[in-house]
Amino acid sequence: MNAPLHTPLAFIGGGNMASAIIGGLIKQGLPATLIDVVEPYAPQRDKLRTQFPGVSVLEGASTALARAGLVVWAVKPQTFKDAALACAAHTAGALHLSVAAGIRSDSMASWLGTERIVRAMPNTPALVGQGMTGLYARPGASASDRAQVEAVVATTGAHVWLQRESDLDTVTALSGSGPAYVFYFLEAMREAGIHMGLDAATAQKLAIGTFVGASALAAASDEPPEV
């Protein structure tokens, strides 16, 4: 793994996606003591402290964030602006990575006062290390910045770089929303199996195994999948 292994990180927001990334980074060797998390919700702060001993969990913006070389924005879109304005003074000079949906990089640059910004659109399989993430970097993000971001998102699965920020909207529809369609079809297959006489556990195992196997087959082929 690259530079983030030795770069202090700050997470603004400590929900499921942040937890998945933090867990992946620690598993890859980043010392927990190099991670700060700002999380306003007290029960979630307690959960993070229990889950990740050594990680510094803060209630709000603090001068402690000034050590961060990379700030990961994992807040809800409606709270992003206020959080950014509160934290901007403590994160001057840092690289910023946002996993918040729908917040354009122009707005982020205005609130944070920097051009070193990368937007990411992950999906829910990232929670188990099998995600697919679309990435867009503003021109002010260097090759080194992009490499740091790649090292971080690699802990949650695969990624693709996009040339246009607007393509993140397409990524949201395709891979961001895609798992919901897979689960819907999976449920339909399971229910069909039960309807035809299989017990629920067997139908579930067959349906999931079919999806896993078909996905592996598609990934191993250079040809586009066809019915």
Question: Which residues does each predicted region cover?
Answer:
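NAD(P)+-binding Rossmann beta1-loop-alpha1 motif at the extreme N-terminus of oxidoreductases
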Residues: 1-60, 111, 131, 194-195
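Short pre-catalytic strand/loop immediately N-terminal to key active-site residues, enriched for Gly-Thr
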Residues: 9, 117, 167-173, 226-227
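Phosphate- and divalent-cation-binding pockets in alpha/beta enzyme and binding domains
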Residues: 20, 47, 82-83, 107, ...
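Short acidic capping loops at alpha-helix termini that bridge into adjacent secondary structure
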Residues: 32-35, 93-94, 116, 201
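Rossmann-like NAD(P)(H) cofactor-binding subdomain of soluble oxidoreductases
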Residues: 42, 52, 61-135, 139
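Internal alpha-helical scaffold of NAD(P)-dependent oxidoreductase catalytic cores
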Residues: 107-116, 132-170, 183-220
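Aromatic-residue-lined binding/catalytic grooves and analogous aromatic/hydrophobic interfacial grooves
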Residues: 178
